[in-house]
Amino acid sequence: KTALAATALSLVRDGLVGLDDPIRDQLFTLRQLLRHEAGLADYGELADYHAAVANHEAAWSADEMMQRLGGARLRYSPGTGWRYSNVGYFLIGRLIERVTDLALEEAVSRRALTPLGLSRVRFAKTRADLQNSHLGNTSNYDPAWVYHGLLIGPISQAALFLDRLLAGHLLPPGLLQEMQTAKTLGGPIPGRPWITPGYGLGVMQGSIEGGFTLCGHTGCGPGSVIAVYRICDGNASACCAGFETGASEGAIEALVVQKLMQTLQLGAEDA
């Protein structure tokens, strides 16, 4: 999601899309899509979706997914609520394709990955694309089930991407600040490091113990979970990406936070 957000915000940077202009033929804006405030549902709510994935079926077409979900029907008025929605990011992908006149993978590569120096990341589009990956039990998984796209590559590339993005190597300061302006989503989450979790424009952001703020993203994929976060302390910063098989978001987040705090502490001692 962060890669899609960075790509979409590069369109805003270049004056090709307005962050707060309604998307064509819709009531919501790009900002609302990016921050999950557009009123859309999520295909993860469909029991049939999870059953089909578990049975190693071929992915439905995007049109069939939207029909099964009733995805065009808003669940609340845009801007008045919050609901995590992969459908929103699927629509962001379509917006990127329409504005750039490029396939999504080419647009993301040209506008986000290549400018940030990433050369070992690609979209998985077929089952064969996952054969040499370390994503847990993926031998029969169809990556087309991820309707907004499934990026794969070395875990180090995820850390490099986030670190360079948040260091300002792609977006101007004002737009980067917009990206990191988060909607607070309640209080502490049991089993996870967040004290005040929040969501910005394609990034999870919030405070953790010690008064530090994390910015990045956690995500569950086929048979695995990844967390990549950046933390700052004055002029010092650290970025870490972690991966493990299974589906425990809290466990991988705890590991990443531990590594980040150790890195900051070592930096302070060296100073």
Question: What function would you assign to each model-found segment?
Answer:
Residues 50-77, 102-124, 129-135:
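Short, charged, amphipathic alpha-helices and their helix-cap/turn boundaries
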Residues 73-78, 89, 138-147:
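Flexible glycine/proline-enriched surface loops and loop-helix/loop-strand junctions
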Residues 9-28, 99-127, 172-177:
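Short, well-structured active-site flanking segments
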Residues 97, 102, 106-110, 114, ...:
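Catalytic loop of the DD-peptidase/beta-lactamase superfamily, centered on the K-T-G motif
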Residues 2-84:
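Active-site-proximal loop and beta-strand segments within enzyme catalytic domains
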Residues 1-17, 33, 69-70, 83-112, ...:
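Alpha-helical scaffold elements that line and support the substrate/ligand-binding pocket
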Residues 21-23, 30-37, 44-45, 49-51, ...:
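Histidine- and aromatic-rich ligand-binding microenvironments
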Residues 38-45, 115-125, 184-191:
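Secretory-pathway/luminal and periplasmic proteins that interact with or process carbohydrate-rich
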